[in-house]
Structure formats: structure tokens, C-alpha cells
Amino acid sequence: MTPDPKRVLDAGEVRERLAGGLPGWSLDDDGIHRTIRTAGWKASLMVTTTIGHLAEVAWHHPDLRVSWGEVEVTLISHDVGGVTERDLALATRIDEVVGWRPGDEDGPFTGTPDDPRFAYLPPPGD
């Protein structure tokens, strides 16, 4: 049975889900949050546009705060006043797409060069 995408999850459920697969996300009264570090202004805009595309095709829109070197993301289902499966699903998709590092996997893509002039996202762990 598919969970009701509009059911508000209790705080314990949300924290458990964040701990089980969404590192970097946290919960407070305003929803779930993550700050994505970037390599600068252009990279922040690219991350914002990427999240905007994902949100639009999902028809579920986050609050974003964009600055040099980071993008803050807040997800909450405003129509029901809490965090739902939709928020967790979009957070997962954001992490998958924005965090994709093709140079770290065996495949046809090399990823961005190590040269900081071409940096998009900081190296993992930075």
C-alpha cells in the first residue's frame, strides 16, 4: 500500500527517516532543512536552478535562500502544515541530483576537473 503523500509525519518519523538516508538534513518547526555548500556564486545559481527544475516537475516547491557559497533549502508541505512523504521524496531527489559526482564512479564521465577554477561543489568532506 502506498503511503498517503499528504499525511503529516510526526517528528519521530521524520527524524528516523533523515537519520536513515538523508544526512545533512535537519528538522525544526519550519520543516526539513539542508545547507548545500557550493564553490561560489555561479555554482549557487546552478544548484538553485537544478532544485527549481526538480521542484517544478514534482509540483512541490521548497523555500530557497541563495548566497555566495551556499544554498539553504527548506521543505514543508504548506497545504497540510507539516512534513510529508512529498518533502522527504524531494529531499532525496535533490541529494541524488545535486550530490552526483560522476568522477567518483566507474563510468563514461570524468566529472569536473580538480582545478579550483572549475569547481562546482566543494570536495566531499570539505
Model-identified regions with their sequence ranges:
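Long, contiguous binding/interaction regions
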Residues: 1-42, 46-126
